């Protein structure tokens, strides 16, 4: 059964934010936008500023959720992160890029009833040089 991808994505982002808060992260911004680029969640893990991409799928039919964070998507997230850093007083905090993958194990009328969550810490980074 096909599910509304926007609803699934919104639910996944909420579940990810709850997961992070439960792990002691301090959520700063959700759905930060810079031009056409977006970062789903910006949060502090201790003193480390985390830019977090959330991917949610209703099945593995189209692959694991983390597989959709392509090199192009990573570049877009990095561009948005650079923009966000310009808004900070301390423009060079310790940063990292994480991915949270959520697989809906059970759905009921487009609502996630049970799920599996995987947190890929430091999943990618900006290449320098």
Curated annotation (Swiss-Prot):
Family listed: Belongs to the UPF0102 family.
Protein name: UPF0102 protein Clim_0016
CDD domains per record: PoNe_Nuclease
InterPro entries reported for this sequence: Restrct_endonuc-II-like (IPR011335), tRNA_endonuc-like_dom_sf (IPR011856), UPF0102_YraN-like (IPR003509)
Taxonomic superkingdom: Bacteria
Coiled coil stretches, renumbered: none
Native organism: Chlorobium limicola (strain DSM 245 / NBRC 103803 / 6330)
GO-annotated molecular function: nucleic acid binding
Pfam annotation, one family: UPF0102
């Amino acid at each position: 059964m096909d599910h509304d991808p926007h609803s699934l994505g919104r639910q996944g982002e909420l579940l990810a934010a709850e997961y992070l808060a439960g792990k002691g992260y301090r959520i700063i911004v959700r759905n930060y936008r810079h031009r056409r680029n977006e970062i789903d969640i910006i949060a502090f893990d201790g003193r480390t500023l985390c830019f977090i991409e959330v991917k949610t799928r209703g099945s593995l039919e189209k692959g694991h959720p983390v597989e959709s964070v392509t090199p192009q998507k990573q570049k877009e997230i990095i561009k948005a992160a650079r923009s966000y850093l310009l808004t900070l007083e301390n423009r060079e905090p310790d940063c990292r890029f994480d991915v949270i993958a959520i697989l809906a194990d059970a759905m009921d009328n487009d609502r996630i009833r049970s799920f599996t969550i995987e947190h890929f810490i430091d999943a990618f980074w900006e290449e320098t040089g």
